Amino acid sequence: MSRKLISLVQPNFQQGPKEYNAHYLPYSVGVLWAYVNQFDSIKTNYQLEDLIWRRDNIEDTVAKLSRCDIVGFSTYVWNKNYNYTLARKVKELNPDCMIFFGGPEMPITKSDIFKKLPFIDVVIKSEGEIILRQLLDAISDNTSWFDIKGLLINKDSQAVDTGNGDRISNLEDLPSPYLTGVFDKIMSEVTDVEWNATVETNRGCPYACTFCDWGSLTYNKVKKFGLEKVFAELEWIGQNKCGFVTITDANFGMFVERDNAIADKLIAVQEQYGCPNSFSMSWAKDQKPEVFDIVFKLIKNPKFNQGLTVSVQSMDLDVLENIKRKNLAQHKIENIFALCDKNNVPVYTEIILGLPGETVSTWKEGFYKIFRAGNHTGTNILQAQMLENAEMNLLQEKLFKITSVPVYDYMSGSYNYNELEECVSVVTSTKDMSMEEMLDSQIFSWFMQTFHINGLTTYISRFLHKKAGVDYSEFYNKLWQYLIEDPWFVAEQDAVRMYYRNWMTVGKINHPNISNIEIHGWNIIHRTTLHMHKDRRYEYVFDLIERFVTNEFELDSNCLNQLLLFQKNYVINYNDISKFPYTVEFNYDFLGYILDDTALETSVKYNFEFHESKDISLDRFLENIYFGRKRNFGKTLITKESV
C-alpha cells in the first residue's frame, strides 16, 4: 500500500535587512512532524512531501501541494491570507485533499468559521503534536475523527467542537526537528538563504494579559524542555550557521540557574562557530537581580549587544488593571534602569498605544514616568492589535468600545508579500481615546522618539532635570511650542499625521521609500530621523535646539555651550562617521554628574566611538535606525578619562 503524501505549511516574510535574505526555518510545523514521525503507524502510512517556509508564487505552490492527500497549515497574523488563499486553491484543484489548520490566528470561537472558510476540513485548537498523531491514525485506520478531543470539524459547513485536547504532559516526548533531520532537505536545496532558527526552552506563560494570546493558548502553566535537548539544538544552530535565533520562552530568566546555563551555552556556541550573529527573547516580567547576570554575560559578546527589554506596556495603574497586567514596582524599575545606564547596557521599554483605559494625558505621562525612572535610550512604541484569540478581542471589545482597522503595510518584510497582502487589526479608538486623540498620541510618540529616544535632546533634558529641576514634561512642552513655529518641523509633523491617518481611513500607510528603505507601520515613527540623515538636516535641527535652550533656560554660557557640544557628539550623524573614534576635552563632567552624582565642574576627556563599520552605506545605516534599535544604534558609546 502506498503511503499518503502530507505537506506542512508555515510561510513567513523575509526577515531583517534585504541583503541578508534571511528566513525562519518552519519550526512550528517541523516540531509537529518530528513528533508524529517517531511512531511506526505514521512512518508506515505517511510520507512528508514538502515543508513550505517562504511566500513563493501562489500558483507554483498550489501545483506542488495539490498532489498531496493532506496539507496542514500553521497560521499566524503574518501568513493568514496567504494560507487561506493557498488552501482554497488546493481544495479547488484537488477536492479530496484534506486540509488541516492550526495556530494562534484561527477563529476558533466563531460559530460560522466553516461558512467563511469552507475549504478547511478540520482545525486543531491547541497544542498540535498529540492531536495531529491521533488525527492521522484515525485517517489511516478509517475511524471517526469525532472521538478526538481538541478539534473543530467541518460537518456540512457547521463547526463540531470535540472539546479541549489534552496538553502534553512531558515535553521530553517531543523530538527536535533540528536533530531529527526534518529541515535537512530544504537546507540542502536552498543555499542562498541565511536561516533563522527558533528554540523552545520551555512552553507556557503564567500571565493572562488581555492584549496577548500567549497565556490562553499555552494553558498558563510553564513546562520545561530538557537542557540536554536545548543545548544540542543550540549546537546544531551554530554548526549550521544560522544567523539569528529566537528563544521563544515567554519569560526568559524566570528560571535563573537554568537560564544562566542556556545563556552560557549560547555564548559558547557563538564563540566556537561564529553563529548565531544575534538573538531575541522575551525577558521575565518580574525581573530579579539575578537576571542582570544573564544580561551582562550576553552583552560582553559584541554580537549579543541588544541589552535588556522591560515590557511595561503602560505606566498607568488603571490601564494595567484593565489588561490584567502587574508591572514591577516603580523603585524596582528605577533600579533596573540605573544599573543598565551605569554599565552601558542598552535597556529597552515596550509600551502599547490603544490599550483599554489609556487617555492622551496618561499616555504622555507614561513617557515622562519612564524618563524619570531612568530609561532614555530605548522605548519601543507599539500600536495595540486585536489578536484573534486574545481576551481584548473576544471579551473587552464591546466593554471598552474598541474600534480597529486592518492595516496592510504594518509589518516589516512586507516588501516580499507578492500579491497577497497580510494585515494587522490595529486599534484606532477606545471609549477613553477618540480617533483624533489617538492621532494626537501617535504624533506625541513620534515627537518623543525623534527628540528624546533617538537622542537629539536626551542629555540636555536630563541635565536640566537634575541641575535645575526642570521636569521632562515642562522641557518637552516648551520644545513643542518652540518647534511648532518652524516650517521644517511643521511639515514633518503634518506628514507623519497624514500617514498615520491613512491607516485609519484606507488601511495603508502608503509612505514612499526613504532612500531605498521601505516605510511601514513598525518604522514610520523613525521617519524624521531617517530624513535628517538622508537630507543632511542635522546641523539645521541642532541649530533649532541650541536656540531653544538658549532662549528658554538660564545657564552659565560656558556650561551651556559645552552641554550642547556634548549633546551633539552623543548622536551619530551619518555624514560624520569617518571621523570616529575621537576624543573631546570638557570642563564639565556631564556624564558623571548625571549618572553618578560626581562633581559637575571637573575636567574630563570623553571618548566618542561608533561600534559599526565606518564603510556602512547610507541605506544600511538607515535600516539600522530600526533594526539596530535594541543595541542603541545611532548613538555614540561614550567613555571618559580624567585630565
For each feature predicted by the language model, list its residue ranges.
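N-terminal [4Fe-4S]-dependent radical SAM core
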Residues: 1-7, 13-14, 154-198
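Radical SAM enzyme core and accessory elements
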Residues: 2-8, 17-18, 41-45, 63, ...
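Glycine-rich beta-alpha loop elements in corrinoid/cobalamin-binding modules
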Residues: 4, 35, 44-168
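Short hydrophobic segments within beta-strands
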Residues: 9-12, 74, 102, 248
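Glycine- and acidic-residue-enriched helix-capping/strand-helix junction motifs
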Residues: 15-30
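Radical SAM [4Fe-4S] cluster-binding motif and immediate context
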Residues: 24, 177-342
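Hydrophobic positions in alpha-helices of CheY-like receiver
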Residues: 36, 89-90, 266, 336, ...
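Conserved C-terminal portion of the radical SAM core fold
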Residues: 70-72, 234-248, 274, 278-282, ...
